[in-house]
Design a protein with these regions (language model features):
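A cytosolic small-molecule/anion-sensing beta-strand core signal
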Residues: 56-57, 76, 95
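Short acidic-glycine-tyrosine-enriched beta hairpin
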Residues: 67-85
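Conserved short histidine dyad/triad with adjacent acidic residue
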Residues: 30-47
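Ligand-binding loop in jelly-roll beta-barrel domains
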Residues: 85-107
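Histidine-centered metal-chelating micro-motifs
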Residues: 41-42, 61, 81-90
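A short, N-terminal "cap"/entry segment at the start of jelly-roll beta-barrel domains
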Residues: 1-28
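Glycine- and acidic-residue-biased ligand/ion/polar-headgroup-sensing regions
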Residues: 49-65
Length: 107
C-alpha cells in the first residue's frame, strides 16, 4: 500500500488554465484531480487506455470521436463518463470545473 499526502501530490499546468494534481499512481492505474478555469480547453487527443471521469463541480462539453462518428455530450456536477481506449476526445470548459479522472494504464 502506498499513501500519498496532499503535500506530496504532483501538480502541473497541463494546458493553459488546466491544473492536474496526481492523487495516486500505481503500476496499472492513475487517478488525478483536474481544476479547469472558465473558458479553458483540452485539445483533441487520444491514449491507448480507458479514461473514467466524474465531475465534482461545473460543466463541460466533451467531444468524443471514433472512426465513423462524433458524439458531443454535456457533463455537469455529479455526472460521469467513460472514454474508450484510442478514441479522440477534447473538452471545452464553459465554467470553472473540477473533475476526478482515472485511467487504466494497461490496454
Amino acid at each position: 500500500m502506498i499513501k500519498i499526502e496532499k503535500k506530496d501530490q504532483h501538480v502541473v499546468e497541463v494546458f493553459e488554465g488546466v491544473i492536474r494534481r496526481t492523487l495516486a499512481c500505481g503500476k496499472d492505474v492513475l487517478m488525478a484531480r483536474f481544476e479547469y478555469e472558465k473558458d479553458s480547453h483540452v485539445p483533441p487527443h487520444r491514449h491507448s487506455y480507458e479514461q473514467v471521469t466524474t465531475v465534482l463541480k461545473g460543466e463541460q462539453k466533451i467531444i468524443i470521436k471514433s472512426e465513423d462518428e462524433e458524439k458531443v455530450i454535456v457533463i455537469k456536477e455529479g455526472d460521469s463518463f467513460v472514454v474508450p481506449s484510442n478514441f479522440e476526445h477534447e473538452q471545452i470548459i464553459s465554467e470553472e470545473s473540477i473533475t476526478i479522472d482515472a485511467w487504466s494504464l494497461t490496454p
